[in-house]
């Protein structure tokens, strides 16, 4: 009947069983669920647990006189008979001394230590129960399959189940709530669980019975933990003996997650501004607990890998009356309550269902993985449903949850419509927007109407059928009197002079040279310019296009050089800037740069 513990090389991707080897009447393929602490435990014989309370509440733990938990956080401080002392702790405060930890934890040592606190230093089972890591009561009771016919199961507790009466007699109904919610197979509580209820009342773990507790905390310091009633309507479990020194880090770390009603304004029951959603109190409590479960799944992912189930796995036909009067267990402002598993499945859906039943396909053969116990094992709790029944119930609960969410949306819709209408009535419409256009179309303001839409011409008193021009009598649309007509005026006789005679070349021949140059430079693009240029050509002048000057050969002097392209000699030039003639000697004159005689217009 004595179990043997063998070491295994485990990997992160393919993790075998948690290291518990059983012989004789042990469970076939008994394993922890994926959110258990995968500690390697050896078998504790019957002789090691009879007649002793097993574990004390404070200051070191002794089993059969030997200290099992010491205040040393870096090694094995003492030994528990039946637990092999060869498995030391793997890191700083990351595991319970005397318990071998599977390599799946890896780097989880500091993470568990920071979240849970100094569990090893105080050696207090109450801390490990409430914090959800280390050696917890769910790990001893539910995860280790303590029932009457367990034989040599994970913990050898034949007969009257002395470990239940000895080790777990200092528990409370609050712990039973955790045991029921975190049982791996999710079935109803066995007879030993029911018997343990009477034994759990001797200590009252969460009801502040420990009188010599030097805790620095008080329940008045945490009003959020004591003000909200439990989801099942039972009495509220106080912080109690959770006020241990070892819980100081986890309370300080998690008190910031205190959930208040105003954090979820869209939920029923919230009163803010003009909003008041109507819903019965039972639905409010259910929805609040579902929200807490979602927060736990998001912010406390350590619980799935450290051996503590935050919301409870799916159960097929667990009796509800066994859990309705167990108050919720709170730690640092976040409630690990016995949430209704129907609502939990409806909110978390495939995630919880997959983690609860993912190992049904793995039970046939191959290396056993971390998952659920098989349905045909001898240690399975009675009353568990088949896989098809679980599927059917899950779909039924999911449908109820969707119908409940639809009711919530229909309850909130009339309020949204009313609030939208009230907001639109309070805010003044934009005069330049679509709402402002309505006042223009309705023509409430006459000035604005005439500016935007114009004025009806028939209202101005105009004769639209008249053949004459209307502008003679129409003064203005804002004028009440018609216009007086065109004003009377007379044109002077000088404006009626006769057309001057056309230009004649004979007239230009009579002008002097200065007059001709004046007409040419002062009347550009005029017929007089052409006539003046023609008269200058008649008098022996020629126009240079490049220099824009008039040239003439000196009389009685021939050019020094004369070719078809150019000629060089002495020339007389008229400078319009100085208005005089100048003499240029030895000047080269290109023939192509000379302007030809202009063509006079014919009248």
Swiss-Prot record:
Induction: Upon infection with a T-DNA transfer-competent Agrobacterium strain. One of its GO terms (cellular component) is CCR4-NOT core complex. Belongs to the CNOT2/3/5 family. It is found in: Nucleus. Disruption phenotype: Impaired stable genetic transformation by Agrobacterium T-DNA. The gene is VIP2. Transcriptional regulator required for Agrobacterium-mediated stable genetic transformation by T-DNA integration in host genome, but not for T-DNA transient expression. This is Probable NOT transcription complex subunit VIP2. It comes from Nicotiana benthamiana. InterPro entries: CCR4-NOT_su2/3/5_C_sf, Not2/3/5, NOT2/3/5_C. Keywords: Crown gall tumor, Nucleus, Transcription, Transcription regulation. Pfam families: NOT2_3_5_C.
């Amino acid at each position: 009947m004595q179990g043997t513990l063998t070491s295994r090389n485990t990997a992160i991707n393919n993790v075998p069983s948690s290291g518990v080897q059983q012989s004789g009447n042990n469970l076939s393929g008994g394993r922890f669920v994926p959110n258990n602490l995968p500690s390697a435990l050896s078998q504790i014989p019957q002789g090691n647990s009879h007649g002793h309370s097993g574990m004390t509440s404070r200051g070191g733990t002794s089993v059969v006189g030997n200290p099992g938990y010491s205040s040393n956080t870096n090694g094995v401080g003492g030994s528990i008979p039946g637990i092999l002392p060869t498995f030391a702790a793997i890191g700083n405060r990351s595991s319970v001394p005397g318990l071998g930890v599977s390599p799946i934890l890896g780097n989880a040592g500091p993470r568990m230590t920071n979240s849970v606190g100094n569990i090893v230093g105080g050696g207090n089972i109450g801390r490990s129960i409430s914090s959800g890591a280390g050696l917890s009561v769910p790990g001893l009771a539910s995860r280790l399959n303590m029932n009457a016919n367990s034989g040599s199961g994970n913990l050898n507790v034949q007969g009257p189940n002395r470990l239940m009466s000895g080790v777990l007699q200092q528990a409370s109904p609050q712990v039973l709530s955790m045991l029921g919610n975190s049982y791996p197979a999710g079935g109803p509580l066995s007879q030993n669980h029911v018997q343990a209820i009477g034994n759990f009342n001797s200590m009252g773990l969460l009801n502040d019975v420990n009188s010599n507790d030097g805790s620095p905390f008080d329940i008045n310091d945490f009003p959020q933990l004591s003000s909200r009633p439990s989801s099942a309507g039972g009495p509220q479990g106080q912080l109690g003996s959770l006020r241990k020194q070892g819980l100081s880090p986890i309370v300080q770390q998690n008190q910031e997650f205190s959930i208040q009603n105003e954090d979820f304004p869209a939920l029923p029951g919230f009163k803010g501004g003009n909003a008041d959603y109507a819903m019965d109190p039972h639905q409010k409590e259910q929805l609040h607990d579902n929200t807490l479960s979602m927060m736990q799944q998001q912010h406390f992912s350590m619980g799935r890998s450290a051996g503590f189930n935050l919301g409870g796995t799916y159960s097929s036909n667990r009796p509800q009356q066994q859990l309705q009067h167990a108050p919720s267990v709170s730690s640092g402002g976040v409630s690990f309550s016995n949430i209704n598993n129907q609502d939990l499945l409806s909110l978390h859906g495939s995630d919880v269902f997959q983690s609860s039943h993912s190992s049904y396909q793995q039970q046939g053969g191959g290396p056993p993985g971390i998952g659920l116990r098989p349905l045909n094992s001898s240690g399975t709790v009675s009353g568990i449903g088949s896989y098809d029944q679980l599927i059917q119930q899950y779909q039924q609960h999911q449908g109820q949850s969707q119908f409940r969410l639809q009711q919530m949306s229909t309850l909130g819709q009339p309020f949204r419509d009313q609030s939208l209408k009230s907001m639109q009535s309070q805010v003044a419409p934009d005069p330049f927007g679509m709402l402002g256009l309505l006042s223009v179309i309705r023509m409430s303001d006459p000035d604005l109407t005439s500016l935007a839409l114009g004025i009806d011409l028939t209202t101005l008193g105009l004769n639209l059928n008249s053949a004459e021009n209307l502008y003679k009598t129409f003064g203005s649309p804002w004028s009440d009197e018609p216009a007086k007509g065109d004003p009377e005026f007379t044109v002077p006789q000088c404006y009626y002079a006769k057309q001057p005679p056309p230009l004649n070349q004979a007239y230009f021949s009579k002008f002097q040279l200065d007059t001709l140059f004046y007409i040419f430079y002062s009347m550009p693009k005029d017929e007089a310019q052409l006539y003046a240029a023609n008269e200058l050509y008649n008098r022996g002048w020629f126009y240079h296009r490049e220099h824009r000057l008039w040239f003439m050969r000196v009389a009685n002097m021939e050019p020094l050089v004369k070719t078809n392209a150019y000629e060089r000699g002495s020339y007389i030039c008229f400078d319009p800037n100085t208005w005089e003639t100048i003499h240029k000697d030895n000047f080269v004159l290109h023939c192509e740069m000379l302007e030809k005689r202009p063509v006079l217009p014919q009248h």
